[in-house]
Amino acid sequence: MTVWDRPETPSRPVPLDRERIVAAAIALADEGGLEAVSVRKVAARLDAGPMRLYRYISSKEELFDLMVDEVQAEILPEEQPGDWREALGVLAQRTRQAALRHAWLADLLGGRPAMGPNGLAVAEATLSAFDGLADVDTVMRAVETVSAYFIGAIRRETAHLRAEHATGLSKHDWQRAHGPHMTSMLATGRFPALAKAVYDGTDVDAETSFATGLEWVLDGVATKLARPPA
């Protein structure tokens, strides 16, 4: 029986339910990452004994599942997308925005499928946009391909943000600090392609990089979904 199927127990003396437990866990994770979340710490935040929480969840892994499903409600589109491209674009962009609000989400993306009610609703909204467009295997590969892109991009962006927080150096501060070393290495002539990228390339922000890459991936998927001539 999953955590969503198991009935909740009556709450006493401090009011408790899964909604309160999940909200407290998300608050802890937002403040200090997943390492800040434990049944004991959540119980302390709620001024309740840890054993009471085990009446609602059986493990920290179940708690993580509930946290992810709560955030899936933020990812769920407000209205049904008009077509497959919009559906995948909305999924990618809303997942990125959720991860920017909840950095810990990046650590839980890409594993087993989300089985909570909100996660299933997100999957349904995405897949239904392909209705009648292609066979189910093609649709699944399309969704997997775009998901692989945006999950990887989100994790990379999250890693950069964590590095900034840990070191106190922005991206440009870090580049300036390492500039002399990079300049001396490129001056050896051993890295001509890298030198061209460093000196001639255009530096873009994370949002632009994400959006551009997403459009390129969607363009590639479109070639596989194109209907053959009648």
What are these regions (language model features)?
Residues 1-41, 58-65:
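Basic, helix-initiating cap at the start of DNA-binding domains
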Residues 1-16, 184, 188-199, 229-230:
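N-terminal intrinsically disordered/low-complexity leader segments
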Residues 20-27, 62-77, 90-94, 121-125:
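Alpha-helical structural segments
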Residues 45:
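Residues within the alpha-helical elements of helix-turn-helix
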Residues 48-57:
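Short hydrophobic/aromatic patch on the recognition helix
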Residues 68, 96-125, 155-163, 192-195:
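Amphipathic alpha-helical segments used for helix-helix packing
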Residues 76-120, 137-146:
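Hydrophobic alpha-helical connector segments
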Residues 122-177, 202, 221-224:
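Hydrophobic alpha-helical bundle segments that form small-molecule/ligand-binding pockets
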